[in-house]
From Swiss-Prot:
<dbReference type="Pfam" id="PF22657">
    <property type="entry name" value="SSB_1"/>
</dbReference>
<dbReference type="InterPro" id="IPR000424">
    <property type="entry name" value="Primosome_PriB/ssb"/>
</dbReference>
<dbReference type="GO" id="GO:0003697">
    <property type="term" value="F:single-stranded DNA binding"/>
</dbReference>
<keyword id="KW-0235">DNA replication</keyword>
<dbReference type="InterPro" id="IPR012340">
    <property type="entry name" value="NA-bd_OB-fold"/>
</dbReference>
<protein>
    <recommendedName>
        <fullName>Replication restart protein PriB</fullName>
    </recommendedName>
</protein>
<dbReference type="InterPro" id="IPR023646">
    <property type="entry name" value="Prisomal_replication_PriB"/>
</dbReference>
<keyword id="KW-0639">Primosome</keyword>
<feature type="domain" description="SSB">
    <location>
        <begin position="1"/>
        <end position="101"/>
    </location>
</feature>
<comment type="subunit">
    <text>Homodimer. Interacts with PriA and DnaT. Component of the replication restart primosome. Primosome assembly occurs via a 'hand-off' mechanism. PriA binds to replication forks, subsequently PriB then DnaT bind; DnaT then displaces ssDNA to generate the helicase loading substrate.</text>
</comment>
<dbReference type="GO" id="GO:1990077">
    <property type="term" value="C:primosome complex"/>
</dbReference>
<keyword id="KW-0238">DNA-binding</keyword>
<comment type="similarity">
    <text>Belongs to the PriB family.</text>
</comment>
<dbReference type="GO" id="GO:0006269">
    <property type="term" value="P:DNA replication, synthesis of primer"/>
</dbReference>
<comment type="function">
    <text>Involved in the restart of stalled replication forks, which reloads the replicative helicase on sites other than the origin of replication; the PriA-PriB pathway is the major replication restart pathway. During primosome assembly it facilitates complex formation between PriA and DnaT on DNA; stabilizes PriA on DNA. Stimulates the DNA unwinding activity of PriA helicase.</text>
</comment>
């Protein structure tokens, strides 16, 4: 079996919540990550933005707290998502979230 598990921390820059036609609650955020890591014995600045999707009842208790400016650590799996205009991007589907602020 292949492994697909990502842990990423950062600051929420955008958030929105909605229910699917099937009645499933979803929250979608944009997570901004900044850090420094060593690569080839050199310190490198790392920056990325990733869309994170929280789905289902288990996240309803934290949905109100997932607002712009909040620091979180999220664990989950990544998947390819195609937008309406046909562009592909990786998104993180949350399995666990920890509020840092």
């Amino acid at each position: 079996m292949a492994t697909n598990h990502l842990v990423l921390s950062g600051t929420i820059t955008r958030s929105r919540s909605f229910k699917s036609p099937a009645g499933i609650a979803h929250s979608v955020i944009m997570l901004e990550h900044k850090s420094q890591c060593f690569e080839a014995e050199m310190l490198r600045n790392v920056y990325c933005q990733m869309q994170v999707i929280f789905s289902g009842e288990r996240f309803e208790s934290v949905t109100e707290q997932l607002k712009s400016g909040v620091d979180i650590e999220v664990q989950g799996f990544i998947a390819l998502q195609q937008s309406r205009n046909g562009q592909n991007r990786l998104v993180l589907h949350a399995e666990n979230v920890e509020l840092k602020t």
